[in-house]
Amino acid sequence: MKAFFDTSVLVPAMVDQLRNHARCFPAFREYFGDGNEGFCSTHVLAECYSVMTALPLRRRIGPLDAQRLIRDTVTRRLTVISLGTDDYLEAIDRVSGNGLVSGIVYDALHLIAAERAACERIYTFNVDHFQRIGAGPIAITAP
C-alpha cells in the first residue's frame, strides 16, 4: 500500500505532546516497511518546520529540534516527492477552477504529489479539503 502523509498527520505523529499523537504515530509507523511505502512532498517538509516551531507547547520545539525531526524521522522513512513550477500552477488551476480560495491550494499540492507517487491513500485531518478538490480514486482518511 502506498500512502501520502499530510502535515496535519505528520506533525502529531512526531510530537507526543499533541492530542492526536496516539492516532497518528501508529499510522506513520505502519509505513516504515513490510511492503508499505510512505510519501510526502517537499512542501510538507516546510509546513512541518513552520508548524512545529510555532506550536504553543510546554516543551517547545526549537529550530534545530524541528530540523532533526524532519531530517531523521520524515526524510529517512518517507519518499519525498519534489514539486516544481508546473505542479504549483496545476494546484492553482485546480482550486481556482473549483472556486476554492486560500490555504486549500496547499492541499492541492499534496494531492498532486500523491497522484504522482500513485498513492492509494492520503492521511490527513483535512479530509473535506481533499474531497472538495477532487481526489478521484485516492482514499482520503484521518488516522
Show which residues each predicted segment covers.
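Short active-site oxyanion
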Residues: 34-38, 78-79, 116-121
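Acidic catalytic patch
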Residues: 16, 42-46, 74-98
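A mid-sequence interfacial segment
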Residues: 83-119
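Generic alpha-helical structural context detector
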Residues: 12, 50-53, 71, 93
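Alpha-helix/helix-capping structural signal
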Residues: 8-9, 43, 86, 109, ...
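Short beta-strand scaffold positions
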Residues: 5, 39-40, 82, 105, ...
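Short, well-structured N-terminal submotif of metal-dependent ribonuclease cores
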Residues: 1-40, 55-68, 132
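Acidic, PIN/NYN-like endoribonuclease modules and their adjacent C-terminal/linker elements
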Residues: 2, 111-143
